[in-house]
Amino acid sequence: VNVTTQSDGSGYLTFASGGTMKFSKAVTVTATAYTAGYDGVGTRTATGTTVHKGVAAVDKRVFPLGSDLYVVAKGMEYGLTRAEDTGMKGPKIDLYMESYQECIQFGRRTGTVYLLED
């Protein structure tokens, strides 16, 4: 993904396919991963949805619940996700993965989260 940033912090993501997405802000975060059924994690999010790939836990003061996000973490693009769960404090994001092994492999990474506009 190529990123074009305006002076106000907003900008566009441009993909190899030629498609674009507009974002209102980019936030540098610490990214981690979680999965259901491990360490007491259930299958329901704070917004009442069922966890699945594309769900993220956030600090709702940083990313409002229901926000569409695009996540790029060091060494990988997680891609589109939605802020549907809580439990993080500050500029952090916890990305849902399908397995514990994926979570271990992901570890803790520095990344950028783009808050997408409608």
Where are these predicted regions, by residue range?
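Solvent-exposed, well-ordered loop and adjacent helix/strand elements within mature globular domains
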Residues: 1-118
